[in-house]
A protein has these predicted regions:
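Short, small-residue-biased leader/transition segments that mark boundaries at the very start
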Residues: 1-2
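Mobile genetic element proteins and their domesticated derivatives, centered on retroelements
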Residues: 7, 22, 85, 106, ...
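Basic, flexible linker segments flanking DNA-binding modules
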Residues: 14-74
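An active-site-proximal beta-strand-loop segment
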Residues: 64-108
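Active-site beta-loop-alpha junctions of metal-dependent nucleic acid enzymes
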Residues: 90-93, 110-135
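Short small-residue beta-strand/loop micro-motif enriched in glycine and branched aliphatics
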Residues: 106-111, 172, 197
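RNase H-like two-metal-ion nuclease catalytic core shared by retroviral integrases
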Residues: 146-148, 153-161, 170-193, 202-214
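C-terminal domain-tail junction helix/linker
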Residues: 197-263
Length: 263
C-alpha cells in the first residue's frame, strides 16, 4: 500500500484529473477506496516522546547545545545536517533501530541494534567509518543532531574514530524538545506503517531492515516535489554511500508500506 501522493506522482501521465478531483470522487463514493484508506485523510496524532536519559550530568552537552548547533550551521551553511534517533520495539524487548536522516534530501538510514546502548550506537559509527572511510564519513556526517538519550551521551566515542580522528560533531536538542529534530520524528511514521507501535523487532534482521528502508526511501513525497528521497539523494549525496550500504530504488508500483512487507 502506497500513499496517494506516491501513486499520483508515479502515474500522473495516466490520470486525467487533479489530486483534488480524486479526493472529491473518494468523498462522494465514486471509487472503492475510502477516506480511511488514505494516510493523510486520517488525523495522525504524534506521540509525545520522553527522554530516557538522566540529565543530572550535563557535561556531554557542553559546547553542543541546540543553540550552539544553530550557530554552527549558520556559520557553515554548506554542511550536511543529519538528525539521529532510536526507534524502540515492543516493551520489554531489546532490539531497536538507530535512524539517521539527511535534511537536504530526506534520505533515512536505519540500522538494527541488539539493544539501546551507547556501545551499540558506537558499533554502528565504527562500522560506517570502516565501510565509508574516514574522509567520506566526515563529509557526510559532519554535523549530527540528536536527543539526550543515554545511548548518545558518550559523545567522545561518537565524535572520534578508533584511531583518534575527529569524524563528526554531535549536538543535542534541548531536553524534551524532540520537535527540534522533527523531520526525523515525522519520518518514523513510515516505519510504523510496517511495524506498528508495540511490535517486537526481535525477528528483524539486517536484511529485512534494509528491505524496509529501501521501500521507505523509494516513496515519493510532496515535500520533494513528487520525487522520492532516494532519487533526490542520488543528486545531492556522494553515491558511494548508496553502494556501501546497499541502498536501492524500489520500482514505483512495487513500493509497499504495510506489515505484510516483512512477514
Amino acid at each position: 500500500c502506497s500513499s496517494d501522493l506516491h501513486i499520483y506522482a508515479s502515474h500522473a501521465d495516466e490520470i486525467a484529473c487533479s489530486r483534488r478531483t480524486i479526493y472529491s470522487y473518494i468523498d462522494r463514493g465514486v471509487f472503492q477506496a475510502r477516506n480511511i484508506d488514505l494516510r493523510r485523510k486520517v488525523v495522525y496524532k504524534q506521540r509525545k516522546r520522553k527522554t530516557t536519559a538522566s540529565l543530572k550530568d550535563r557535561s556531554f552537552r557542553k559546547d553542543r547545545s541546540y543553540k550552539e548547533f544553530l550557530e554552527y550551521i549558520a556559520a557553515n551553511k554548506s554542511v550536511y545536517v543529519v538528525e539521529m534517533d532510536t526507534v524502540e520495539g515492543a516493551k520489554g524487548t531489546s532490539p531497536c533501530f538507530l535512524t539517521m536522516f539527511f535534511r537536504n534530501c530526506s534520505l533515512m538510514l536505519m540500522f538494527l541494534l541488539e539493544e539501546q546502548t551507547q556501545k551499540e550506537v558506537t558499533r554502528i559509527f565504527d562500522h560506517l567509518t570502516e565501510l565509508l572511510g574516514i574522509e567520506l564519513f566526515q563529509k557526510l556526517f559532519e554535523v549530527i543532531l540528536t536527543d539526550n538519550g543515554h545511548e548518545f551521551q558518550d559523545r567522545q566515542s561518537l565524535e572520534y574514530s578508533k584511531n583518534g580522528e575527529v569524524r563528526t560533531r554531535i549536538y543535542y536538542c534541548d531536553p524534551n524538545r524532540s520537535d527540534q529534530k522533527g523531520a526525523l520524528e515525522k519520518n518514523h511514521e513510515y516505519i510504523r506503517y510496517v511495524l506498528p507501535k508495540g511490535t517486537s523487532f526481535e525477528k528483524m534482521t539486517d536484511k529485512t531492515t534494509l528491505l524496509l528502508l529501501n521501500h521507505i526511501n523509494s516513496e515519493k513525497r510532496d515535500s520533494l516535489n513528487g520525487h522520492s528521497p532516494y532519487e533526490v539523494s542520488r543528486l545531492l549525496l556522494d553515491n558511494r554511500l548508496h553502494k556501501a550500504l546497499g541502498l536501492a530504488e524500489i520500482p514505483a508500483d512495487e513500493v509497499t508500506l504495510i506489515p505484510a512487507l516483512i512477514k
